C-alpha cells in the first residue's frame, strides 16, 4: 500500500487531528514528520472525550496503530513524558509509540534563547510560541544538535552538550545578561528523562519502509500548515520546518515515490495565530462570530486566533505546492445561520487584480480581498452524514470551494466528533 500525507492547507489549526482520527482505524501506522510542541491537535472521540496532543501522533488514540515520532520532529523530552503520562492516566495504551533515533532533542538552552530573543526583538518579534523550536532547528542545520540516539551513548552526549554550551552560554550571558547553564546538570537531567523513552527509540526509516513493502498503510501527519512552511509560507512569519507534503518524505525517511495521496485539510473559513499578513482577516462582528462559534483558540498557546473568510487564493496555492489530491473541509457547521458567506476569489494589489499568490510578502501585505458572495443557510447541519443531507446552499458552498480550490472535497466535517463527518469519496479505497 502507498503512503498518505495529511497536511494543513492554510495557517494551521485546520482540523488535522480529526482527519487523522477518522482514518486511524484503517491504517497501520501514523507518523508525525515535522514540528514540535509548538502545535496542537484536538481529537474528540465518539465517547465525547477530548484529547489535546502536541508531540504524539493522533493515531495513538486508535487501538492497534503503531505511531512514530519521525526524524523531522524536534522533541522536548519533558513535554513528551508529560504527554505520555497524561494519556496513560486516562487509560490510553501508548505501548505502540516509537521515536526515530534521528529526531532532534529540544534542550533547555533552546527554550531560554527563544524566550529572551523574542523579548529582545520587541515590536519586531515574529510571534513564536517561545518553546525553543526555532533554536533547535537552527542547531540541527548548524550540525550541533543533540539527537535522540545520543542518549544511548553517555560520553558522546556529554561531549556534544559541552560543545554546544560553550557557544550558547556566551549568547545567554554576554548578549542577554542571563545565567549560564551547567553542562553536567543538563546532561544529568536529560539522562533521567531518557529513562522514560529510551525503550521507544527505533530505526524508523527501516520499519516504515518494511511496513510499506508488507502492504501496510502509513499515514504521514503534518503539523501547522502550508502558509507556515519555512520555504513556501508567509516568511518570516512561519515555523522553522516544512509542513508541506515535500517535508513528509524528508521527515519520515519514506521515499517520495511511496506517496500516492496528499490529503489537504481546509477549514471552511480561514484562521491564523500570531503575526503576519492575512488578507481576509475580519475585525467586525463577523470575525467575532467565527471566533466564538468556531471556538478559535490555540490548542498549544491558548491565544485567540485571527479569523477571516475563506481564501481561495491560498487554497489554490496549497493545492499547487503540495500536489493535493483530495481535500477534507472542516467546520462547515460554523457557517450555519449566516445570511451570506463571502469567499475571497482573488486579490487587488495597487489597483491590479490577481487570482494567484503574490510573489513577494510586501505585495501580500498590500493585497485587498476580492469577494464573491455566496448565499448562506440557516439549518443545523451537525447531524448530516451524507452529502445530500446538507441544505442545498451548503452543498453549493462546498461545490464552489471545490471548484476554486483546485482539488475535490472528499470529506466534510460538520462538528468536532469523529462521527460528525460526511465522506463523499473513500480516500483509502480509491487510492489503494
From Swiss-Prot:
SMART domains (UniProt xref): Adenylsucc_synt (SM00788)
Instruction: Give the cofactor note.
Output: Binds 1 Mg(2+) ion per subunit.
Which Cys-Cys disulfides exist here? none
Renumbered to this chain, the signal peptide range is none
The listed locations are:
Cytoplasm
The record lists substrate as bound by 299-305
Q: Which residues bind IMP?
A: 13-16, 38-41, 129, 143, 224, 239, 303
Q: Which Gene3D superfamilies match?
A: Adenylosuccinate Synthetase, subunit A, domain 1, Adenylosuccinate Synthetase, subunit A, domain 2, Adenylosuccinate Synthetase, subunit A, domain 3
Annotated transmembrane regions? none
Reaction(s) catalysed by this chain, per the record, are: IMP + L-aspartate + GTP = N(6)-(1,2-dicarboxyethyl)-AMP + GDP + phosphate + 2 H(+)
Which residues of the sequence carry a binding annotation for Mg(2+)?
A: 13, 40
Give the residues the record marks as binding GTP: 12-18, 40-42, 305, 331-333, 413-415
Q: What is its EC number?
A: 6.3.4.4
The enzyme class is ligase
UniProt keywords (A-Z) are: Cytoplasm, GTP-binding, Ligase, Magnesium, Metal-binding, Nucleotide-binding, Purine biosynthesis
User: One MF term from GO for this chain?
Assistant: magnesium ion binding
Gene Ontology cellular-component terms listed: cytoplasm
What this protein is reported to do is described as: Plays an important role in the de novo pathway of purine nucleotide biosynthesis. Catalyzes the first committed step in the biosynthesis of AMP from IMP.
- Summarize subunit and interaction data from the UniProt record for this chain: Homodimer.
Q: Please state which protein family the record places this protein in.
A: Belongs to the adenylosuccinate synthetase family.
Return the protein name. Answer: Adenylosuccinate synthetase
- Gene of this entry: purA
